[in-house]
């Protein structure tokens, strides 16, 4: 028997968390967070992490997993999420997959096999070859090894060419093999995939309000504390939306008002990219908050 999963995706500030909590309370569910920044400890305000009060209402999984100077791959996330989903279902509860990181959601509900971690040696070896022979020579090798992948990569895209070759060198398998399941549903799940898609003017207003609230709650102080305890401002976790602008403010590159406006502008851009991602996903249903009650009635068959 397949495990029923309800996915609630959508852009930042679209209302995913509140909707998921409301539905999980009604359906006796638990939430599996799919947010690539909420996995970090100590980064609460800038990632709009569910509050302790919200987490006391409904269990939230895959939040506060790693430290800001650590990393997690989509493959590692996939493994953890599937283990948690199995556990939630075994206890007679409904798993809710909730978040704005589309790649994380896709990694869980599609039949994707991720390549193993590759030793840094291979990347250095390829980099040295590029320096000696030129990027064109290395790209030509990729065309012979994995023409499917090469056909999707610009001959000037050094990062993706390097990634494709390092996987092949390390595993003996073209990276295209690992991407075959990208449009195939994971066979153990029965998924309802919903995407909150509010009108742009409403979404942008919510973004403005959210950023203002983050400042009121202490985003500046949270960022300063992360730096004070020794985390480098160059960490990928701290070079994300909100934190990077506040770091520039703390360095004297912005006044606070300019930093806040920059966060709002970049958040709007990020939300637009998220919306595009979700609209291009397969087997999704776009809904507005106003339609949620009708949609809930349709999916209430998931109640145990």
For every predicted segment, state its role.
Residues 1-304:
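Phosphate/pyrophosphate-binding catalytic cores of soluble transferases and nucleic-acid-acting enzymes
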């Amino acid at each position: 028997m397949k495990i029923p999963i309800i996915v609630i995706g959508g852009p930042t500030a679209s209302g995913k968390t509140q909707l998921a909590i409301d539905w999980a309370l009604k359906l006796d569910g638990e939430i599996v967070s799919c947010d690539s920044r909420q996995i970090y400890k100590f980064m609460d305000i800038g990632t709009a992490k569910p509050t302790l009060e919200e987490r006391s209402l409904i269990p939230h999984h895959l939040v506060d997993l790693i430290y800001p100077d650590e990393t997690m791959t989509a493959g590692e996330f996939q493994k953890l999420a599937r283990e948690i989903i199995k556990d939630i279902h075994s206890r007679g509860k409904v798993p809710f997959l909730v978040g704005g990181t589309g790649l994380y959601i896709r990694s869980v509900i599609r039949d994707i096999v991720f390549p193993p971690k590759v030793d840094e040696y291979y990347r250095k070896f390829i980099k040295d070859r590029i320096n000696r022979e030129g990027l064109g020579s290395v790209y030509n090798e990729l065309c012979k090894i994995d023409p499917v992948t090469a056909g999707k990569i610009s001959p000037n895209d050094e990062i993706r060419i390097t990634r494709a070759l390092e996987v092949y060198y390390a595993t003996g398998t073209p990276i295209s093999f690992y991407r075959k399941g990208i449009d195939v549903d994971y066979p153990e799940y029965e998924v309802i995939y919903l995407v909150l898609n509010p009108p742009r003017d409403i979404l942008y207003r919510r973004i403005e309000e959210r950023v203002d609230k983050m400042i009121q709650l202490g985003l500046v102080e949270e960022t300063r504390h992360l730096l004070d305890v020794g985390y480098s401002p160059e960490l990928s976790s701290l070079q994300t939306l909100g934190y990077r602008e506040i770091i520039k403010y703390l360095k004297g590159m912005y006044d606070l008002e300019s930093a806040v406006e920059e966060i709002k502008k970049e958040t709007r851009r990020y939300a637009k990219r998220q919306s595009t991602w979700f609209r291009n996903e397969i087997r999704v249903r776009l809904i507005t908050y106003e339609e949620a009650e009708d949609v809930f009635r349709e999916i209430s068959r998931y109640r145990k």
